[in-house]
Amino acid sequence: METDGRLKAYKFVAYAAVGFSIAAVASVLLTLPMVYSYVSHVRQQMHHEINFCKGSAKDIFAEVNYMKANAGPVPPRNRTTRQAYGGPEVNPAPNLQCEGCCLPGPPGPAGAPGKPGKPGRPGAPGTPGTPGKPPVAPCEPTTPPPCKPCPQGPPGPPGPPGAPGDPGEAGTPGRPGTDAAPGSPGPRGPPGPAGEAGAPGPAGEPGTPAISEPLTPGAPGEPGDSGPPGPPGPPGAPGNDGPPGPPGPKGAPGPDGPPGVDGQSGPPGPPGPAGTPGEKGICPKYCALDGGVFFEDGTRR
């Protein structure tokens, strides 16, 4: 009985261990792909964010360098004297226009909301709290005094018989017994194997000559067994060609051939559109009267 109980307990422990092992292996097989996919997703996201930060930094540096290159010295303001009323302007101020500068436009529309940030670091531990109030009740509960011991009761009924005990140890081997009386003879055994051939005996005396009689053929004997199969015959003539089979599958494309020879040059294209007219040139005119030089705008230099 005890051995059966132990065997059942051992079987239960073994099955439980195997079940827990299988559950652990299954959980590992299920969680590993999930962890790998999450790590790869986080890695790709970090890679995209790093690339975005690098691109933003490059754009900022490029804008700063562009502003440094285009920010030349400030030209001095040309403050001329006031014109006399009714008189011609002596030194007119040049018409300075800022072609390379532009005012910033209105702000663009608001962009899409960014991704939620990562959780912050845990805060510092708080200060210790104030001590609590003293307890009203005592810490250790008071136990009432024990009751007086009761008198001993009558003996109970006898219990059921116990289980049989374990088998005892093996006893020591006994002494060997005395030899028994010889038994009755057994049955006759099978004949033994044939003995070796004896030596040849002496040659006998020659017999009397036989009477000569004509030979008479005997009766025909029984037909003999069939002989072994003969050797294979010569190969036959080749048969006629069978019908053509179905077309085979399309083969893989072959390698690219060598480049072909250059073709002939095409005809000349149509003439392009007429260009914009050039700047008006300066053509001086000479005057023979006083030797001065006049230009088309009427000025003299």
UniProtKB/Swiss-Prot annotation:
Residue spans crossing the bilayer: none
A GO-annotated cellular component: cuticular extracellular matrix
Span of the signal peptide: 1-37
Furin-like endopeptidase recognition region: annotated segments: 79-82
Pfam families, alphabetized: Col_cuticle_N, Collagen
Compositional bias of kind Low complexity: 194-210
Annotated site residues (Cleavage) in this chain: L289, D290
Family annotation (SMART domains): Col_cuticle_N
Molecular function GO labels: structural constituent of cuticle
Predominant localisation class: secreted
Disulfide bonds: none
Keywords in alphabetical order: Collagen, Cuticle, Disulfide bond, Repeat, Secreted, Signal
Gene Ontology biological-process entries: collagen and cuticulin-based cuticle development; cuticle development involved in collagen and cuticulin-based cuticle molting cycle
Domain of life: Eukaryota
Localization annotation: Secreted; Secreted, Extracellular space
Disordered: annotated segments: 109-284
Residue spans of biased composition, Pro residues class: 131-164, 184-193, 226-258
Assembly and interaction partners: Collagen polypeptide chains are complexed within the cuticle by disulfide bonds and other types of covalent cross-links.
Family the UniProt entry places it in: Belongs to the cuticular collagen family.
Protein name, entry field: Cuticle collagen 1
Record gene name: sqt-3
